[in-house]
């Protein structure tokens, strides 16, 4: 169950891993092999196809072992709110804890998904960048329809702010103010804000 959206962006050059056992050899693409280790990649813009793959992988891993953590690695500029919310809701719905790790960037919806990981298990690597802001609009059409869409985007903004407030420990007013414009954070700032729990230099010793 590899991440085809990652593969296409890499020009089709996907490393293969060959495993040997008593029954012979089996080749996996690198993403499928890491899925066996309960590692999922959320790479690139958040859109419906990518979200479906991530959701499917989480549900599969829950069916395999509902008591073992899932590790979600995020490097995303954000994207579709509805696609992102399908991932977020699944993260909250399934039994396993979902540990989130930012590698590169987690902006907009990517930052919300990073913050939505299991409490105490949200991380970034040292040179990662996080960014939170309000959802973007841009609907064109009749005045009545524009008014409808304006109300909807304001409702979505409030919903996203409430989610960020829940996971960061900030109050809703603070989040509303801090997301009014693009708000970039490094790892230290993200920890202080409550977006993540720790910045990792090395993999923790198990």
From Swiss-Prot:
Fourteen ClpP subunits assemble into 2 heptameric rings which stack back to back to give a disk-like structure with a central cavity, resembling the structure of eukaryotic proteasomes. The active site is at residues 108, 133. One of its GO terms (biological process) is protein quality control for misfolded or incompletely synthesized proteins. GO terms for cellular component: cytoplasm; endopeptidase Clp complex. Keywords: Cytoplasm, Hydrolase, Protease, Serine protease. GO terms for molecular function: ATP-dependent peptidase activity; ATPase binding; serine-type endopeptidase activity. Its EC number is 3.4.21.92. It is found in: Cytoplasm. InterPro entries: ClpP (IPR001907), ClpP/crotonase-like_dom_sf (IPR029045), ClpP/TepA (IPR023562), ClpP_His_AS (IPR033135), ClpP_Ser_AS (IPR018215). It comes from the Bacteria. Cleaves peptides in various proteins in a process that requires ATP hydrolysis. Has a chymotrypsin-like activity. Plays a major role in the degradation of misfolded proteins. Its main location: cytoplasm. Belongs to the peptidase S14 family. This is ATP-dependent Clp protease proteolytic subunit. It catalyses: Hydrolysis of proteins to small peptides in the presence of ATP and magnesium. alpha-casein is the usual test substrate. In the absence of ATP, only oligopeptides shorter than five residues are hydrolyzed (such as succinyl-Leu-Tyr-|-NHMec, and Leu-Tyr-Leu-|-Tyr-Trp, in which cleavage of the -Tyr-|-Leu- and -Tyr-|-Trp bonds also occurs).
